[in-house]
Amino acid sequence: METVGRFQAGDYVVFACLFVVSSGIGVFFAIKERNKAPSKEFLVGGRQMSCGPVALSLTASFMSAVTVIGAPADVYRFGASYVIFGVAYTFVVFFTAELFLPVFYRSGITSTYEYLELRFCKLVRVAATLIYIIQTILYTGVVVYAPALALNQVTGFDLWGSIFATGIVCTFYCTLGGLKAVVWTDAFQMVVMVVGFLTVLIQGSSRAGGIENVWSTSRTGGRLQVFDFDVSPLRRHTFWTLSVGGTFTWLGIYGVNQSTIQRCISCKTEGHARWALYLNLLGLWIILFCAVVSGLIMYSYYSHCDPWSSGLISAPDQLMPYFVMEILGAFPGLPGLFVACAFSGTLSTVAASINALATVMYEDFVSQCFPDLSNRAASWISKALCVAFGVACTTMAVAASYMGGIVQAALSIHGMCGGPVLGLFSLGILFPFTNLKGAVGGLIVGISLSFWVGVGAFIYPAPSNNTHALELNTAGCNITAAAFEPTSATVTQLTSDRNWLADSWYSMSYLYYSAVGFIGTVAAGLLITLLTGPMDPKLLKPGMTRSVKEVMCFCTEKFTEADLGEGKEDVGDFGKAWEKHPDQGCTLRMDEKFRCSCDNQQENGNTNAGFDHNETSIVQKKL
């Protein structure tokens, strides 16, 4: 592989500024919050965050360096159909904001998995927490290693230096500043990501002959064929796999993921939390747009000489760094800006993961074993957990360098684990009659199905005709025949002992792994519940479940207010209302004209230990 340039002093300075500013934010909040010892202040920011920084933090955390580097390469090879993920993002944010968020926010919990104990039992909570910890450590390690390797091979940027710097800096500001430092650092890193992308878009389009030429070349090369309505689940990317499969995959990441919900419940009101999610949707669209256009510009620039097929680079993930070094290498500091852009995605993802891991470990294990810890002891333990998980994630990144092809399996863990856990929460929230046996049995079935298809796909790779990779041209390359490696070398070599499962079940699009786990969990959970005897929904206090009418009836909170006995307080301000009186005994009513109202319904007995059961009243309010 040839290199088009190496990092210069100016590039290292620009890149170092990212780490210095990120660390500085952690120091700032450590000093500012030094007299606030409670662990809740450290783990959820005192529940006083506003929607703006939380929205930026959410976007930055889930648009990792894998997106910054991998998405443009995907568009380069398979076309702009990747943009359909925007449809999936829309559904994901809606269901998170209207279905899952109200339940988590109003219950006053810190760990999302605490809900599972309130709804089912501690065993279910522990199982889901362990799944989350394993999946997050594994995925976070890969998120650190994969982009560092691609950048190292193209730019010469030090591999181990970047890995250890990422782990040390993230652990540093997470430990010092807690969630507030994570959120504000993510906000800064989101700005860096956008600036880095814009730099590539402006210079790249100029070098490719302008946007009009980019559009024309992309159309000629088939990159603008966005809508493929083939319903086959075996096709890698179609409208249905990206929109439906993408929705299930990202809903498992957003809807019930500790990292997302932790920042949402850190908001001062439920209204701020909702706004954070919807503003985050705008951020997701912006990053997605930048990634797709970058891929089209890159294809237009290399339309006559593909560097991957011609052997100039050894893997598709190196396309974006190679392109950046070629178009920005003559401008001191700009390659460093792009690397800062890529590592902003990595830093935000790793920091969010470390903070979330520390939270679930403390809430789901430490506080359960030692319920009488002082505030100061709890705060120090929370910080120690941040350090421990920072070391674990960095160690996982180092281990990824020795894993070879296992890295691909690790990147699929989110889908394989996220779907069954999403199904578990859906059983609890949407189906009030689901019993404990149904929840446990459904989770086992869902995990088994999703890992069956995921591991099977790793052992028996899907045939290349399922991916529909578009043609790449090397006619304009100034290379010798001996140096040329044809594109056909990348075609998956299929073994002769493949059985019928290999070409059907194991060849399913990776975006459906989460859907398989979700459907398996819900279907098995409901069947087992019906066979073993459904639970009486009256045994559950209101707030543990959420009906479809409540999800779709947007006026529910807007036209009601809570009387807490100490003055009126808007129901939209559930951060305070539910902290004092989380069980409001509210039942939604809808008349024949589809007008919503919320009637008070008091129930005696069958209380849930997770809620405070003082009386409240809900009254209709005309706006």
UniProtKB/Swiss-Prot annotation:
GO molecular function: monocarboxylate:sodium symporter activity; secondary active monocarboxylate transmembrane transporter activity; symporter activity
Location of the protein in the cell: Apical cell membrane
Glycosylation site residues: N465, N478
Record key words, sorted: Cell membrane, Glycoprotein, Ion transport, Membrane, Sodium, Sodium transport, Symport, Transmembrane, Transmembrane helix, Transport
Transmembrane segments: 11-31, 51-71, 84-104, 130-150, 159-179, 182-202, 237-257, 277-297, 323-343, 387-407, 413-433, 439-459, 511-531
Catalysed transformations (reactions): (S)-lactate(out) + Na(+)(out) = (S)-lactate(in) + Na(+)(in); nicotinate(out) + Na(+)(out) = nicotinate(in) + Na(+)(in); pyruvate(out) + Na(+)(out) = pyruvate(in) + Na(+)(in); propanoate(out) + Na(+)(out) = propanoate(in) + Na(+)(in)
Spans within the Extracellular topological domain: 1-10, 72-83, 151-158, 203-236, 298-322, 408-412, 460-510
Record family assignment: Belongs to the sodium:solute symporter (SSF) (TC 2.A.21) family.
PANTHER family named in the record: SODIUM-COUPLED MONOCARBOXYLATE TRANSPORTER (PTHR42985), SODIUM-COUPLED MONOCARBOXYLATE TRANSPORTER 2 (PTHR42985:SF15)
Protein's recorded name: Sodium-coupled monocarboxylate transporter 2
Organism: Danio rerio (Zebrafish)
